[in-house]
């Protein structure tokens, strides 16, 4: 049976029908949607509008539910109660008697009819639920006892509770229609719109399937239809018989129905052909149109040259004569067209005599051969809109130039004028929307059809799992915004996830090819019911089977180790007791033991699984994943899309699915745990008697908008990747060092080595820029080819930092080939493991992953064959150093005999046991025996081999680490020899990444935490990644789980406090006072000043609920406070004596931007100060604007050491609702982009007129005068600018005046040889320095941590940007001196102890000045004058900003921005952009010459204006 659709009026929902749906949903598929009326749609032809009819129909189609009783008598009783609830119980006058009757009938009954729930109960309960009088009695406990019992009994049931909560219709609770909830942040109303009188239209051309761009248009029109309780006309634009096809009309109607859009009227443009023709003849007779036979190409050229046609001045009679030829369709008539006579000299090309009618002799699908002339869309549209009563015509901004033509036609014909409302077209990356291009994909067989999930058609995206509700929420979030931007599909899918995540049931599926059995002997074969959704009990329960044998993912099994405790989801903790592998090292099965009493799931691996049981066999399933059809995000205008077609965009995986998958229906959306969301494209079919085969369940992956990798099977392996990388990178240094002949490496090898290194840089750069996959793959392929060539020529693997040596080897080297070969093979396995992990992490195609895994397994098998041991990560084969002298060969360098090797392995294994026990924080009773056994094994090893046991990873690194340690202590010049087991050994273990101490495993050291302290990206190479690392590693920012919101850590907040202290002090000197206004703004207040809030409209965040209760009216979270503060000003100002009012507040604001968030620079919540003043005169306000602007400049220049350009914003860029805006602009040379530092606005009287801030002017008694206002603001963006300008490749560089810590004191030279007395004296000296510096107001911190070396501390505080590092050691104390290291230059200064205070103060001031000077020089070299557009474009592309002659016109500025836009990103991850105006500098670089023209070449220049790319 086809799915039913219940439409519900949210203002008056039929609770009884909704309850019926809840009770029959197990038998019948019924979808519920919101609309303007209550009805049940059974098919296109059958619709029920009467509630009782709906109830009876639902009950009769779901016979097993028993809602309509079990016999004729019960049917009759139910009919009685249906009538009773609709009449007596709904009447105020008869309510008392009706309740008495109901109470009597329920005195001995649980249900009204029979012994089970029926329609009678649903209907009567729903009526009482919506009855205010009954609800009042219930609250006052005045209800009749049996009715109350019965009502409460039903209300407690899940279905009643669910419906009653979601569709609360109690009159004492105001509801908000859910459509309004979708309008989050979009309150732009239609001009002139009146409730109930709005008519909108959706006019598609019947020439193809609707795509997502059409869906936006349709849903926007529906939004205004519903919001204004108006009318939506669905009109087919069939003005072109060549394109119009009847088949597509049916297709489009189906697409509209899929979107749950219900038009009030269906029309065709062809319905009005006669009327349109009469209007055309009217224009001819009035001399406003003429017939032209100019060939098309010539006409196009004339329009471009603004040349009039030879027929433009024809007489009316001549035009009518030619018009008749057109109507006949004669050969001459076919060469003609009817043109409007408007203005051939217009700057708007659409006004240069556009075509109104053309001659086409093809038959029309609806009118046949009746007409030979057909109107153009541009002529027919305004006429039909007027005739059909359209009040508001919604059109995309690409039609903007045609709006003038639209209104000309309306005025020329003297007909009613609709209002055009513009919105932005939906542009999506990696997508083509052209019907011609989409048809090519279908014809080429690259897709399955027009409903292919890769297609942007309505049916395509719905088939891929997009929900109509998700699409509506996305469209509503965009609203009627006019900003034209290219959006990622991720945005849409993220909205969709919000809809499906709370309701999608959770199931399990395992990759069939890689499942591994797990034997759990003590498990019982049984079934339990668990929640389908862990957070939503309404989704219901599902059966989960348990058995002694279960299956898990092979990728998960690879991550396990024996003895590990693993959490099996929906079962509990299980211990892995044994891992069985085949000869190739592949895991074949696992043995496990239940540990269900252990409920600690915090540190365990969580995996999915399926039981082997005959009661519930796994269901075969195919998971299909789709990629973009187009590989390039944005295609250029002239680019051929066929060059960027992704020929491998569909991938399938065969899965073993949850037995519950057999019940899925087509279109059901589920989540496969740890894999993602899927939609059922084809339900499972059991074995067919015809084919003797079962049909698998086909599931299509639904993207969910995430950009970070999801946790998947084997995800634990990713956590191992990092240590493995370190092992492989350090491994070459531990292997045998071949003896090198005196001659240098050959020139050819060196050249090849350099080519490999250069190509490696190319690959890294492409990945950093997130280049197209095919570009990266090509570069990687070339890199691998070069590496293979290098190995062939040199006989060695390419290793970064290890250039080729000569091939000559001594005889002693050749005598030991096996150790080197083993090590080389070990390194190959490690590298191939990295390849496999990377492919899995990137979700590469299955074929690629399989090929890489097979290669890995063959390498492991080869390694085992050669060494006789399994490959173990972190345990490379023992190696011997190749020495030229025979004497050196005799020295033992590791285990040599079979017995020694076996003992070596036992020590290593026992070391692992000890480390694991300590990592798991096992009890001392367990750890001590393990350590004792380890020590005994080490003693045995020493007695057998004569040498101490040393882990392989520590070999050969002592010399290097000794140098490293000496370097760390160089301020003390500590060059004493150190014992083997002292510092160097310990550092060695860190550097190798193995977590082992130099003395072996388990000797009191335990596993050491590995940290990647320094920056791994360079500012000049990958600015975005560098910035991200700086703010996190320097402890400025902590990321938060709400996108666009960040935690300001003390290190960054202290900078804001410094700015706040300075600025607060200065504004108070001016007479400004601090205050605080609420964060919440009413909708009415926010909408008062349209021009002001228009820019903020898309960014406003709304509060719509309190708990689960919808608010009567949504409340905005302030994007700015003008509309909050100024009504209060109006109350406080009564006369001129109440002025001026000068208030400031330090607070947070929320602007829910859709752009890519960037900490400090573009965030959804940020801190700021906002000042708002009101004055009696214009001049007073103007003075304050400049005073505040100068304070902002001082914040940047005196505190942050950043030079700024002071100036005034252009008309386009000024503050919405203000008279003019002044600004300070900073420049970031690393990106070649400017950034707005702070603004100070003169608001004139705009807001005072809106909010009635008036006073009586003493000069003109009796007259009211509006106040003059200004506002000004500075945000935490300042911190981001400071980081970008001063930071370097070592981290932050903090200007001393805002640094949280200006000097950090670090003790050096603490070694084992240092006595306790000297150590304490050194600590005391450090604290003494701290006390002395605090005494002269220097912010200082002493780092006395004993678990970090001095070198580590140096790096740490350099990364955090501390201006000065003070190093002091025992020798410094004896010499009464210390070493000061400057962060800005790295310069080291030796300073006498007695001069500490004075010298450090001087250094700090010098650092502040140096930073400012350096940044000023940077700005000076990057800000130039350009007098032509060509020169300006070159300047922009070289990463500079320029002052150009400019006319100040908004259209001109838009043109400059469009002209200077470029295809390539300004920086990785940043959107492409054109230049925008930054400010009109108060002090330009040069004076404007008289007669100078704007760079556009059209208008005289008014001033030099600073333009550039900007954040």
UniProtKB/Swiss-Prot annotation:
Zn(2+) binds at residues 1447, 1452, 1494, 1496. Residues 299-315, 708-728, 957-975 have a biased composition (Basic and acidic residues). GO terms for molecular function: ATP binding; glutamate-tRNA ligase activity; GTPase binding; proline-tRNA ligase activity; protein homodimerization activity; RNA stem-loop binding; zinc ion binding. Residues 296-315, 708-741, 794-823, 868-903, 952-1015 are annotated as: Disordered. It is found in: Cytoplasm, Cytosol; Membrane. L-proline binds at residues 1120-1122, 1151, 1241. Disulfide bonds: none annotated. Residues 1006-1511 are annotated as: Proline--tRNA ligase. The gene is EPRS1. The keyword Cell membrane does not apply. It comes from the Eukaryota. This is Bifunctional glutamate/proline--tRNA ligase. It is a peripheral membrane protein. Residues 807-816 have a biased composition (Polar residues). It holds the Pfam family ProRS-C_1. A motif ('KMSKS' region) lies at residues 432-436. Homodimer. Part of the aminoacyl-tRNA synthetase multienzyme complex, also know as multisynthetase complex, that is composed of the tRNA ligases for Arg (RARS1), Asp (DARS1), Gln (QARS1), Ile (IARS1), Leu (LARS1), Lys (KARS1), Met (MARS1) the bifunctional ligase for Glu and Pro (EPRS1) and the auxiliary subunits AIMP1/p43, AIMP2/p38 and EEF1E1/p18. Forms a linear complex that contains MARS1, EEF1E1, EPRS1 and AIMP2 that is at the core of the multisubunit complex. Interacts with TARS3. Interacts with DUS2L. Component of the GAIT complex which is composed of EPRS1, RPL13A and GAPDH. Multifunctional protein which primarily functions within the aminoacyl-tRNA synthetase multienzyme complex, also known as multisynthetase complex. Within the complex it catalyzes the attachment of both L-glutamate and L-proline to their cognate tRNAs in a two-step reaction where the amino acid is first activated by ATP to form a covalent intermediate with AMP. Subsequently, the activated amino acid is transferred to the acceptor end of the cognate tRNA to form L-glutamyl-tRNA(Glu) and L-prolyl-tRNA(Pro). Residues 748-804, 821-877, 899-955 form the WHEP-TRS domain. The WHEP-TRS domains are involved in RNA binding. Residues 877-890 have a biased composition (Low complexity). Phosphorylated at Ser-998 by RPS6KB1; triggers EPRS1 release from the aminoacyl-tRNA synthetase multienzyme complex. In monocytes, the IFN-gamma-induced phosphorylation at Ser-998 releases EPRS1 from the aminoacyl-tRNA synthetase multienzyme complex, allowing its association with the GAIT complex. Phosphorylation at Ser-998 is specifically required for the RPL13A-mediated interaction of the GAIT complex with eIF4G. Phosphorylation at Ser-998 by RPS6KB1, is also induced by insulin through activation of the mTORC1 signaling pathway and promotes the interaction of EPRS1 with SLC27A1. SUPFAM superfamilies: C-terminal domain of ProRS, Class II aaRS ABD-related, Class II aaRS and biotin synthetases, GST C-terminal domain-like, Nucleotidylyl transferase, Ribosomal protein L25-like, S15/NS1 RNA-binding domain. Its EC number is 6.1.1.17, 6.1.1.15. Keywords: Acetylation, Aminoacyl-tRNA synthetase, ATP-binding, Cytoplasm, Ligase, Magnesium, Membrane, Metal-binding, Methylation, Multifunctional enzyme, Nucleotide-binding, Phosphoprotein, Protein biosynthesis, RNA-binding, Translation regulation, Zinc. ATP binds at residues 1151, 1153, 1162-1163, 1236, 1239, 1275, 1277. The modification Phosphothreonine is found at residues 355, 897.
């Amino acid at each position: 049976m086809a799915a039913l659709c219940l439409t519900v009026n949210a203002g008056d929902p039929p609770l009884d029908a909704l309850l019926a749906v809840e009770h029959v949903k197990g038998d019948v598929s019924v979808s519920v949607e919101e609309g303007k009326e209550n009805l049940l749609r059974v098919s296109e032809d059958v619709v029920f509008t009467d509630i009782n009819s709906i109830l009876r129909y639902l009950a009769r189609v779901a016979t097993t539910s028993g809602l309509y009783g079990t016999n004729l008598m019960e049917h009759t009783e139910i009919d009685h109660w249906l009538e009773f609830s609709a009449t007596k119980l709904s009447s105020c006058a008869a309510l008392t008697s009706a309740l008495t009757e109901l109470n009597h009938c329920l005195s001995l009954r649980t249900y009204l009819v029979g012994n089970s729930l029926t329609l009678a109960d649903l209907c009567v309960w729903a009526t009482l639920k919506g009855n205010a009088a009954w609800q009042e009695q219930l609250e006052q406990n005045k209800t009749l006892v049996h009715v109350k019992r019965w009502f409460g009994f039903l209300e407690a049931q899940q279905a009643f509770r669910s419906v009653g909560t979601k569709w609360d219709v109690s009159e004492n609770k105001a509801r908000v229609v859910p459509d309004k909830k979708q309008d989050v942040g979009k309150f732009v109303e239609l001009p002139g719109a009146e409730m109930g009188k709005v008519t909108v239209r959706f006019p598609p051309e019947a020439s193809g399937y609707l795509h997502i761009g059409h869906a936006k248009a349709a849903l926007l029109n529906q939004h205004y239809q519903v919001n204004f309780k108006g009318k939506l006309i669905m009109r087919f634009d069939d003005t072109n018989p060549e394109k119009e096809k009847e088949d597509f009309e049916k297709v489009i109607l189906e697409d509209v129905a899929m979107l749950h859009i219900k038009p009030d009227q269906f029309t065709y443009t062809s319905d009005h052909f006669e009327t349109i023709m009469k209007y055309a003849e009217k224009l001819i007779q009035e001399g406003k149109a003429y017939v032209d036979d100019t060939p098309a190409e010539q006409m196009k050229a004339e329009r471009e040259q603004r040349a009039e046609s030879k027929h433009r001045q024809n007489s009316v009679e001549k035009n009518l004569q030619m018009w008749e030829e057109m109507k006949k369709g004669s050969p001459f008539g076919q060469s003609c067209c009817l043109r409007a006579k408007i203005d051939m000299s217009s700057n708007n090309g659409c006004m240069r005599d556009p075509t109104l009618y053309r001659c086409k002799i093809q038959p029309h699908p609806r009118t046949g051969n009746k007409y030979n002339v057909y109107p153009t869309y541009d002529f027919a549209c305004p006429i039909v809109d007027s005739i059909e009563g359209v009040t508001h015509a919604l059109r995309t901004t690409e039609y903007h130039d045609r709006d003038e033509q639209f209104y000309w036609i309306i005025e020329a014909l003297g007909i009613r004028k609709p209002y055009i409302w513009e919105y932005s077209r939906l542009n999506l990356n990696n997508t083509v929307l052209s019907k011609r291009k989409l048809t090519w994909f279908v014809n080429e067989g690259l897709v399955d059809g027009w409903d292919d999930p890769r297609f942007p058609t309505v049916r395509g995206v719905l088939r891929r799992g997009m929900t109509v509700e998700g699409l509506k929420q996305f469209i509503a979030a965009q609203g009627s915004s006019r900003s034209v931007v290219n959006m990622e599909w991720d945005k849409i899918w993220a909205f969709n996830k919000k809809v499906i995540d709370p309701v999608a049931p959770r199931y399990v599926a395992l990759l069939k090819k890689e499942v591994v059995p797990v034997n759990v002997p003590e498990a019982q074969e049984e079934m339990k019911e668990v929640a389908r959704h862990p957070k939503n009990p309404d989704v219901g329960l599902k059966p989960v089977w348990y058995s002694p044998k279960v299956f898990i993912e092979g990728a998960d099994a690879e991550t396990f180790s024996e003895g590990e405790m693993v959490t099996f989801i929906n079962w509990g903790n299980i211990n892995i007791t044994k891992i069985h592998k085949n000869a190739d090292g592949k895991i074949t099965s696992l043995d496990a033991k239940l540990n269900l009493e252990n409920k600690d799931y915090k540190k365990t691996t969580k995996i999915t699984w399926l039981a082997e049981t005959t009661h519930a066999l796994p269901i075969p399933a195919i998971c299909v994943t789709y990629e973009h059809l187009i590989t390039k995000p944005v295609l250029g205008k002239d680019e051929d899309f066929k060059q960027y077609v992704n020929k491998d965009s569909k991938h399938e995986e065969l899965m073993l699915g949850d037995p519950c998958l057999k019940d899925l229906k087509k279109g059901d959306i589920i989540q496969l745990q740890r894999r993602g969301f899927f939609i059922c494209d084809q339900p499972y079919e059991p074995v067919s008697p015809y084919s003797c085969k079962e049909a698998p369940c086909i599931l299509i992956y639904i993207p969910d908008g995430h950009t970070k990798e999801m946790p998947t099977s084997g995800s634990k392996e990713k956590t191992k990747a990092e240590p493995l990388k370190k092992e492989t990178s350090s491994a070459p240094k531990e292997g045998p060092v071949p003896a090198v002949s005196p001659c240098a490496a050959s020139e050819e090898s060196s050249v090849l080595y350099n080519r490999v290194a250069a190509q490696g840089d190319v690959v890294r750069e492409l990945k950093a820029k997130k280049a197209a996959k095919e570009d990266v793959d090509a570069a990687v392929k070339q890199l691998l080819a070069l590496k293979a060539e290098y190995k062939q020529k040199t006989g060695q693997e390419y290793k970064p930092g290890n250039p080729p040596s000569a091939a000559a080897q001594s005889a002693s080297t050749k005598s030991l080939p096996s150790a080197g070969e083993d090590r080389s093979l070990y390194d190959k396995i490690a590298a191939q493991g990295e390849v496999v992990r990377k492919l899995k992490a990137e979700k590469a195609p299955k074929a690629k992953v399989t090929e890489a895994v097979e290669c890995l397994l063959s390498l492991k098998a080869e390694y085992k064959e050669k060494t006789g041991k399994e490959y173990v990560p972190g345990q490379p084969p023992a190696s011997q150093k190749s020495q030229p002298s025979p004497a050196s060969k005799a020295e033992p360098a590791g285990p040599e005999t079979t017995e020694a090797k076996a003992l070596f392995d036992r020590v290593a294994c026992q070391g692992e046991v000890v480390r694991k026990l300590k990592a798991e924080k096992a009890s001392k009773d367990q750890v001590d025996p393990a350590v004792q056994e380890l020590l005994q094994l080490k003693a045995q090893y020493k007695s057998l081999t004569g040498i101490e046991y040393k882990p392989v990873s520590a070999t050969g690194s002592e010399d290097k680490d000794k140098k490293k340690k000496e370097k760390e202590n160089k301020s003390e010049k500590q060059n004493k020899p150190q014992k083997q087991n002292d510092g160097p050994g310990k550092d060695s273990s860190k550097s190798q990444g193995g977590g082992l101490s130099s003395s072996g495993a388990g000797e009191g050291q335990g596993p050491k935490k590995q940290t990647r302290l320094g920056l791994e990206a360079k500012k000049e190479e990958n600015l975005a990644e560098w910035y991200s690392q700086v703010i996190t590693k320097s402890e400025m920012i902590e990321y938060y789980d709400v996108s666009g919101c960040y935690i300001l850590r003390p290190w960054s907040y202290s900078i804001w406090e410094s700015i706040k202290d300075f600025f607060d002090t200065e504004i108070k000197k001016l007479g400004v006072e601090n205050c605080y206004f609420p964060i919440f703004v009413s909708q009415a207040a926010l909408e008062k000043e349209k021009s002001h809030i228009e820019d903020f409209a898309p960014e406003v965040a709304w509060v719509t609920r309190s708990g689960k209760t919808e608010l009567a009216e949504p409340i905005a979270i302030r994007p700015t406070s003008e509309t909050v503060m100024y009504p209060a000003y109006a109350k406080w100002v009564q006369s001129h004596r109440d002025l001026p009012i000068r208030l400031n507040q330090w607070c947070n604001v929320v602007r829910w931007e859709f752009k890519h968030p960037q900490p400090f620079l573009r965030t959804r919540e940020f801190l700021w100060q906002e000042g708002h003043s009101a004055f009696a005169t214009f001049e007073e306000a103007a003075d304050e604007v400049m005073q505040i602007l100068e304070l902002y400049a001082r914040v940047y220049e005196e505190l942050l050491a950043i030079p700024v350009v002071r100036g005034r914003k252009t008309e386009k860029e000024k503050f919405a609702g203000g008279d003019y805006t002044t600004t300070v602009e900073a420049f970031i040379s690393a990106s070649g982009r400017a950034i707005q530092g702070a603004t100070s606005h003169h608001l004139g009287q705009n807001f005072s007129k809106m909010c009635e801030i008036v006073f009586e002017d003493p000069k003109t008694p009796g007259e009211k005068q509006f106040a003059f206002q200004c506002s000004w603001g500075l945000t935490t963006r300042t911190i981001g600018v400071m980081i970008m300008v001063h930071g370097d490749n070592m981290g932050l560089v903090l200007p001393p005046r805002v640094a949280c810590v200006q000097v950090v004191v670090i003790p050096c030279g603490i070694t084992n040889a240092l006595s306790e007395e000297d150590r304490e004296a050194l600590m005391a000296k450090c604290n003494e320095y701290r006390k002395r510096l605090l005494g002269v107001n220097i912010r200082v911190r002493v780092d006395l941590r004993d678990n970090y070396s001095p070198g580590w501390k140096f790096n740490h505080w350099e990364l955090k940007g501390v201006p000065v590092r003070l190093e002091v050691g025992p020798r410094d104390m004896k010499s009464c001196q210390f070493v000061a290291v400057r962060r800005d230059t790295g310069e080291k200064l030796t300073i006498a102890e007695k001069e500490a205070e004075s010298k450090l103060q001087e250094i700090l001031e010098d650092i502040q000045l140096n930073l400012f000077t350096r940044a000023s020089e940077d700005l000076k070299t990057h800000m130039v004058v350009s007098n032509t557009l060509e020169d300006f474009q070159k300047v922009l592309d070289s990463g500079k900003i320029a002052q150009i002659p400019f006319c100040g016109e908004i259209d001109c500025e838009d043109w400059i921005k469009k002209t200077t836009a470029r295809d390539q990103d300004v920086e990785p991850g940043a959107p492409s952009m054109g230049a925008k105006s930054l400010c009109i500098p108060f002090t330009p670089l040069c004076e404007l010459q008289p007669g100078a023209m704007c760079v556009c070449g059209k208008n005289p220049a008014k001033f030099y204006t600073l333009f550039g790319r900007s954040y």
